[in-house]
Each structure stands twice: as C-alpha cells, then as structure tokens.
C-alpha cells in the first residue's frame, strides 16, 4: 500500500475504492481527484485500479493511505495503456466526506457505480430546477449523518448513499431490507435517509459482522405515506471478513434510485409564428407566457423554440432565416414588445402602436415592416427615457455583465448602418477589429454615442422581457428549450471580432439527403477547431453560458457537424461538391497503387459534345460559345469567368447575351451546374495530392464512361471514405468538442441527428447523454419507409414532423401512393385512405408518438391543431415553416389563430391532455412522474418478500 496523500500525518486511514465495470482489451480504470493522493486532477498521476472477477462482475479496486480528516472530489476514468482517457464519467464530480468517527488505522471501503450519462440527465437544470423543482429540495433541512455511538470490534458502519432527483414536496427516502435495522422489508420501518444536498440522501447504519451479507432496496415515501419501492433486483452488500484487516466503514454509493423511465411531452413553435392580441405582426418574447399557459393546460412540460439571436445582416426579409446569426449573443429586436418599454408611453406613440397593430395583422409575417415599425417606435421611446434607463442600476448591471459581447455588437450595428453593408471587409480601417478601435467607437464623447446606446437599450429590454418569460415558465414547471445553430453568418460580429476561429474561404452545408437531393449550402464559414481548442473552446462556452440565462434545455442543430462538417469552397452555390472535414483523404500514392493515374480526367469536369447536345439540344452551340472552350476535339472545359457555381450565376445575371436565355435561365443554370459537377474525384484546394470521392459519383457520366476495373476500385474507395475509414477520427473529434459544450452549462442537451449518420454518432451520443431525434417519415433504419415509434430508444425525442419538413397535414396530402402505404402498413387498414388528414388520422399518429418509449414527444403546434377540424381550414401547404431546398426561403409562417383564443378552447386542451395522461407521460401537476407504477410494483414485491 502506497501513501500518496502528500501529507505528513500520524493519523491515517486506508481508503479502498471498488467499482464494477467491464473493460475491453487494453483498457483499465483509474481515479483522479482534487487532492494529491488522487493526482490533483492529473489523470496520469491518478490512482490506478486493479481488476478481480467476482461472480459475473469485474471489480476494479485500489487502495490509498490518507489523513483521517481527508475530503476530496473525484471521478473514475477508462484509460489505455498510456493512461490516455478513453471515457470519463458523466454528471457532477463525486464528493467524498469520511463518516464521523473514523479513527487512525481504520479501513474505509467506498463502493461506487459508474455514473452513466443517462443517470446524470435528471441532475440537469431542466429537471432539477423546473420539472422536479429543485426549490423543493433546497427547502429541505440539510442533516448530517452520525451514529452517536462508540464502535465495538464486531461493528461495521454501513453508509447508504443514493441520488433521488425525482421527489415530490414532502417526500422522503428510506432504505428497507432483510435485517431488523432496515425494517425487514416493511417500508414504514425502514431506515430513514437524510437529505444532504444536490439530490443526495444518506444514512449510517450500524451492523454486526455476522449480519452480512445484506439485501436491500431504496423506497420513496410521499407526504401522504404512500410507498414507492425502487424497481429491479434487490441490492446486495457483503464484506470480506477473511481480510487481515476488514473494512470498518463501508460506503455504499448506489447511484440513482431505480425508477421507471420518466417521459414527458412538449410543443414546438417558432416565436415569430405566434399570434396574440398584443403582438405587432410577429410573435414576441412576452407571448411565451401565453404559450406556457396553453402548454400547462394541455399537459406539456416543454416549449421548444427556433433560434432567437439577431440575424440583421442584409436589412431585408432574407434575415428571416433564424439560423444565420449576426451575433450568437444578441437577441433579435423582432421579438421586442414595444408596449412594455415604458410605463409612461405618450398618447401619440400609443396611437402609432395601435395603428401598427392593425397594419401588421396579416396572414403571414411581414418581416421588414414589423421590424421597421418596432425599431421606429422604440427609438421614440428611447429619446424620452434614455437618461432614466441608462442611469438605472439594473441597466448598469446588465451592461457590466454583458459588455464583452454587447459593445462589439453595438459597434458592429453602427458600422453596418454607416457603411450600408455588414460585409466588414468593406469597412476600411475598421475591417480589422481591435480593442483600441472598439473603445473609441463606443466612447461617450462621440457624436454617434446615442446610436450605440440605443443598441444597448434594445438588448437590455429584450433581456428583461425574455427573462420574465423564462422565469414564468420555470414557475409553471415548463422547460424552455432553445436552439443552438451550427453556424454563424460570414458577415457577423463573431467573424469580425474572432476571425481566426473561422475558415472564411469555406462554407458549411450538408450532403444530399432526405431534405435535398442536391445537398445544402448554408453559406456559413466552417470552424477552425484547432484554433478554438487553444482556449478550451472559450467562444462555445460563452455561447452556452449565455443561452443558459434563459433556457434549461437546448437542441444542437446538425450535431453531425461536431463529428465532421460538410465543407464546401466559398465559390460553391449548391451543397453537392463538398468533402467532410476532418477526414482521411485518398492520397495520390493510394490511388496510384490501385492503378488509378489519370487524376485530371477524374477531377476536372468531364464535358463531351454529345453531353452538351443531350442536355441543351440545339441550344448547345450558344452554351458552348458563351461558357466553354474546346480544348481538344469534342472535349470542353469552362471559361475562366464561369468555372465555379457562383461565377455561373453572376454571368447568367450580368451577361450581355442575357436576352438569349432569359426564359430558360433556371434550366440553363442547372444544366451548367450539372456539367461543373460531372467529376469523380474532388482535388483538395490546399493539397493537390489529396482527393475526395464526389458524393453520388455513380450518377455522373464521368464515372459511367470509365472502364469497369476503374469503376470497381472507385466504388470500393467511395464506400471506404464515406462509411469506414473515418469512424474513429470522427468519434475522437466529437469527444474533444461535445463534452466542452455539455459541461459549459447544466442545460439538458438534445441533438438533431438526421441525415447521413456515421456509425459512430449514436454510440457517442449515448455515451455523452445526448438525446437524439426521431422523425417518423425519416427513419434511421435503411430498410424502412416509415419509422416505428414503439421501437424508438428511450434517449430520443420523437415527433411526426419538424420545422424543416412539411407538416403532418401537408405530408398526408403530398403523395397519394405514400399515403396508401402508410395507411396500410402503419395504421393497418386496407381501405382507401382519406385524401385529407382528418382529426381521426392525426389523432392516431399523434397518439403513436405519445405512446412511444422516447423520453420526449415534442409536436409542432400545427400538428396538434390538426386534431380539431376547426383549425384545419387553412391550406396545409401554408403551414410549412421552412423549405430546405430553397436557400432563400422566406421564414414567415404565422398561426392563423391567436394564443388567446386557443387558451379559450378548453376542448382541444382537454383532448391533448388526455393523450398525455393515457400515455403515462408526466405533466405539470403530476408528482414524481411514475408513482402509480411504482406503488403497484412495491406492493407486489413486498407481499412476495423479495
């Protein structure tokens, strides 16, 4: 036994750590902790554990000598032979406090269980501070656990430790078991545990050596005295009495009290889509209070939103796209309620607000008009109240706490308006950001200081209004779930202030998938992860910290981007000809060894005269004359001024020959893009000896005109690149970045994992406790047309649709053949399906999702309104929020009913709540979420004397 405590003390105790854990070959376990005895959090200096087989378990154990007053934090780690971390525990750091009475020479045995990510979920703020309302636990009297009795030689002190976050007000936890001290399985006589904080309950029990082994279980007892025994087999504890010096104290750190899986439900709607009696043509933060009330009445524990950050890049309706952030910290002025800016709004401004309400009360959102109206009114109120607000203590505190992002944001907005562009490369000497320039721009002595302060003022009120709505939701036990976009606009505050964090010569997108057969190009620059890692991803940590001010859960948009991103050159307009970053490319040497040598033939557009004739008919000569050069007989290449997608778009738009193709511009552009994309390999622009297989290469004539030997090699290399060789690289990449996000806040994290999913994604998400997404029409199983909700895994969110696809009603109407197949295979009827999605059909599909095993069932509000004929009068296509195939889609969908009127409709709220309750999902007002089934099981097991 080694003394690693780093302390000189005559009074020492021996700690024996034990943990059951099955490892793979080459793996081992160690402990790292806060004290020198455990490496001071340096894993390589931690306490190594040794494995021993005991029955069906592999027990890892280790000993260390420490001082009698020793306390520490610690965690277990799976490491390789070089002590590199392969896996670490989830949740809070473990805390070790030795029991009172431990004396010099005692042996204290600590028996732990590996902390899985799924267990740690219920310690996240969504559960701890909202659903299970941590304030109830905070109100509990914290008690110490002591015996007040001197020990005899045959005595062993057992400390029971269990986590129980799912506990109603007034409830307690007991341990019941096989011996008298534990009540002989009578829960009312069990050993009561003391609450010690952070959802942890403890109690000491004095047992004689002869009483081992013991069997026991934990049990919740409600304020009314109703017992709910934990699920699963009996827990067991024994001591090794054959040891020369057996353990005097045994700490049974048993993890979480075992309960039936908690399941909840929620509603999803963009803020801009909300309609209320108070809004100015678009939903507002304060409307969330109405939405929360409706959610509670309908049995929902969660409200999910789209991104809410400022997107004011172009100064027009293009900015309606909520995923293209001007700032990842600033809130969007569109969601401001101007009526709440002051308690003393003059009559003329009130009249202007009333007039604006009438003018903006349209079927869809008028993005430009609503934003302009709000900013105009806000400026007038600002002029009247700026001194009062800017000198208030709450504003000064807001500015002080947020100045790191707020001042650059305000300066950016001023410069954007001054130069009439958000492209900061056109701002002259202000193109390059510096702290000195910023300080001058926002200093009080400038002529434009009021403009700077106006942006502060707007952000302050947005913060106050969203904070009010968030506090209201927490009070009502409703989670607000935000959305973390994968990218930022290339003309944004963030790329101006932190240019080295972004690869500005690239664009982010997605390869062809369900959403778009041509792939997607979102235009965001990709991230420079290597640079971001230098400060442990500080920019990301700041983003999550800011989000956590309002939200207790969030959706990670395109979580695949944290494994690998689909990177496109900045001259691309579509998303087809990209490559994954990071990825292991096909090297020139590798291709040569396979017998592939004509790299130019495979990596440049393959354009033959016969292809031109086939694609453009008799018009091919005009196309060739304007866009192509014939470099050898009947073989063509693009001219320099149109050899990229963006150049083609510009030439079609500006050419003097435009009259020749005006009516055919779209088809000509598509045809030229097809020619440009007619390649087999993509040459790396940064290393000409590296290549990447073009996605769907077999769809090209470039591939089809190759010899069979080359085709077979390319097929094999294609599969290897996309589905094999990258898996470990992508796993390691995700394990570098995602844990930083998850540990930056205590929000509950969900990942949007739709599209082309590498095999490594779901295991990593499971390991990290990330909740996935399942959309019925987009099954992750390759051989299914429709997902089967009853077979979804627990760690998922299930939904019949989402904002990136048509609603349930529209989907039903789109394709008659698909509708018939769904009606037959899913609903189970051979009858002719109705041509429209009736409330009965909607009810069946919605109920499928409520009944699913998924932790969350979250429904777009449009799909819930389909449950009642009254709300299905609007054409279904008009309810679609986004069309991913259109990069310039106008995000303007607005509900055709107000939240006020929905709150008055008791019938639909009752219909939805009945679906929630009958599915066994938790709802606001229901305690614990699983009492009934727990009580039934408890009665069965107690009567059977487990």
From Swiss-Prot:
Major place of residence: cytoplasm
InterPro entries for the chain: Carb-bd-like_fold (IPR013784), CBM20 (IPR002044), CBM20_DPE2_1 (IPR034840), CBM20_DPE2_2 (IPR034841), Glyco_hydro_77 (IPR003385), Glycoside_hydrolase_SF (IPR017853), Ig-like_fold (IPR013783)
GO CC field: cytosol
Protein's UniProt keywords contain Repeat: yes
GO molecular function: 4-alpha-glucanotransferase activity; starch binding
Matching PROSITE patterns: CBM20
Localization annotation: Cytoplasm, Cytosol
Broadest EC class assigned to this enzyme: transferase
CBM20 domain boundaries: 7-115, 150-264
Keywords assigned: Carbohydrate metabolism, Cytoplasm, Glycosyltransferase, Repeat, Transferase
UniProt KW Nucleotide-binding keyword: no
Region (Disordered): 919-946
Catalytic activity: Transfers a segment of a (1->4)-alpha-D-glucan to a new position in an acceptor, which may be glucose or a (1->4)-alpha-D-glucan
Pfam family, one: Glyco_hydro_77
GO biological-process terms attached to the record: carbohydrate metabolic process
EC number: 2.4.1.25
Family: Belongs to the disproportionating enzyme family.
Function: Cytosolic alpha-glucanotransferase essential for the cytosolic metabolism of maltose, an intermediate on the pathway by which starch is converted to sucrose in leaves at night.
Name by which UniProt lists this protein: 4-alpha-glucanotransferase DPE2
């Amino acid at each position: 036994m080694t003394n690693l405590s780093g302390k000189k003390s005559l009074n020492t105790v021996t700690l024996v750590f034990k943990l059951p854990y099955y490892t793979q070959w080459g793996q081992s376990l160690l402990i790292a902790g806060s004290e020198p005895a455990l490496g001071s959090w340096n894993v390589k200096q931690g306490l190594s554990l040794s494995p021993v087989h005991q029955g069906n378990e592999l027990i890892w154990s280790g000993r260390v000598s420490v001082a009698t007053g020793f306390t520490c934090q610690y965690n277990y780690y799976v490491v390789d032979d070089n002590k590199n971390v392969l896996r670490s525990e989830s949740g809070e750091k473990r805390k070790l406090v030795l029991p009172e009475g431990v004396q010099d020479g005692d042996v204290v045995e600590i028996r732990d269980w590996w902390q899985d990510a799924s267990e740690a979920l219920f310690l996240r703020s969504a559960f701890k501070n909202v659903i299970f309302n941590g304030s109830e636990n905070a109100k509990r009297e914290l008690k110490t656990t002591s015996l007040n009795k001197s020990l005899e030689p045959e005595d062993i002190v057992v400390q029971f430790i269990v986590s129980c976050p799912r506990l109603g007000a007034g409830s307690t936890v007991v341990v019941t078991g096989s011996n008298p001290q534990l009540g002989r399985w009578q829960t009312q006589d069990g050993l009561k545990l003391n609450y010690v904080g952070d959802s942890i309950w403890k109690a000491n029990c004095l047992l004689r050596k002869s009483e081992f082994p013991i069997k026991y279980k934990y049990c919740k007892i409600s304020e009314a005295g109703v017992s709910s025994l934990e699920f699963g087999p009996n827990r067991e504890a024994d001591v090794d009495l054959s040891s020369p010096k057996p353990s005097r104290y045994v700490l049974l750190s048993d993890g979480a009290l075992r309960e039936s899986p908690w399941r909840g439900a929620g509603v999803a709607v963009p803020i801009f889509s909300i309609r209320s009696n108070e809004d100015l043509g678009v939903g507002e933060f304060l409307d969330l209070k109405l939405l929360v009330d409706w959610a509670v009445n309908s049995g929902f524990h969660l409200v999910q939103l789209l991104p809410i950050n400022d997107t004011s890049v172009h100064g027009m309706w293009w900015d309606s796209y909520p995923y293209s952030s001007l700032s990842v910290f600033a809130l969007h002025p569109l969601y401001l309620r101007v009526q709440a800016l002051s308690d003393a709004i003059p009559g003329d401004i009130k009249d202007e607000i009333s007039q604006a309400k009438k003018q903006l009360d349209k079927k869809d959102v008028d993005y430009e008009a609503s934003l302009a109206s709000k900013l105009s009114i806000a400026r007038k109120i600002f002029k009247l109240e700026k001194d009062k607000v800017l000198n208030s203590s709450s504003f000064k505190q807001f500015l002080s706490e947020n100045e790191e992002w707020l001042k650059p944001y305000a300066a950016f907005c001023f410069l954007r308006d001054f130069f009439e562009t958000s492209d900061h490369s056109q701002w002259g000497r202000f193109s390059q950001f510096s702290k000195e320039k910023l300080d001058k721009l926002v200093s009080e002595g400038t002529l434009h200081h009021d403009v700077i302060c106006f942006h502060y003022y707007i952000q302050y009120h947005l913060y106050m209004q969203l904070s009010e709505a968030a506090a209201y939701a927490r009070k009502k036990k409703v989670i607000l779930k935000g959305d973390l976009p994968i990218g930022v606009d290339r003309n944004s505050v963030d790329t101006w202030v932190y240019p080295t964090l972004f690869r500005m010569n690239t664009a982010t997108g997605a390869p062809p998938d369900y959403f778009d057969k041509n792939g997607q190009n979102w235009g965001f620059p990709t991230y420079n992860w290597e640079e971001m890692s230098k400060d442990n991803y500080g920019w990301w940590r700041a983003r999550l910290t800011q989000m956590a001010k309002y939200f207790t859960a969030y959706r990670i948009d395109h979580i695949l981007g944290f494994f690998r991103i689909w990177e496109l050159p900045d001259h691309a307009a579509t998303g087809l000809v990209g490559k994954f970053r990071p990825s292991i490319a096909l090297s020139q040497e590798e291709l040569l060894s396979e017998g592939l040598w004509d790299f130019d033939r495979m990596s440049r557009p393959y354009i033959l005269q016969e292809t031109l004739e086939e694609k453009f008919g008799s018009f091919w000569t005009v196309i060739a004359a304007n866009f192509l050069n014939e470099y050898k007989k009947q073989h063509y290449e693009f001219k320099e001024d149109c050899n990229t997608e963006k150049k083609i778009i510009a030439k079609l738009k500006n050419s003097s020959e435009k009259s020749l193709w005006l009516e055919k511009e779209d088809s000509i552009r598509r045809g030229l893009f097809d020619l440009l994309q007619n390649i087999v390999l993509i040459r790396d622009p940064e290393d000409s000896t590296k290549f990447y297989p073009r996605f769907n290469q077999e769809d090209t004539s470039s591939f089809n005109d190759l010899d069979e030997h080359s085709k077979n090699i390319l097929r094999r290399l294609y599969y290897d690149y996309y589905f094999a060789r990258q898996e470990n690289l992508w796993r390691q990449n995700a394990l570098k970045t995602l844990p930083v996000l998850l540990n930056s806040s205590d929000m509950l994290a969900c990942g949007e994992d739709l599209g082309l999913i590498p095999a490594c994604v779901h295991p990593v998400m499971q390991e990290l406790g990330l909740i996935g997404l399942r959309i019925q029409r987009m099954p992750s199983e390759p051989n299914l047309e429709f997902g089967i909700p009853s077979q979804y895994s627990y760690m998922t969110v299930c939904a019949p649709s989402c904002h990136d696809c048509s609603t349930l009603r529209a989907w039903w109407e789109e394709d008659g053949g698909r509708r018939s197949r769904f009606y037959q295979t899913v609903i189970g009827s051979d009858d002719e399906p109705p041509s429209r999605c009736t409330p009965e059909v909607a009810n069946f599909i919605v109920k499928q999702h409520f009944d699913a095993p998924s932790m969350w069932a979250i429904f777009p509000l449009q799909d819930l309104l389909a449950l009642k004929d009254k709300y299905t009068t609007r054409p279904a296509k008009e309810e679609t929020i986004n069309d991913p195939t259109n990069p310039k889609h106008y995000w303007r969908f607005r509900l055709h009913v107000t939240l006020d009127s929905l709150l008055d409709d008791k019938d639909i709220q009752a219909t939805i709540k009945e679906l929630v309750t009958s599915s066994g999902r938790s709802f606001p007002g229901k305690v614990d979420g699983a009492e009934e089934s727990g009580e039934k099981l408890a009665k069965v097991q107690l009567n059977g004397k487990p």
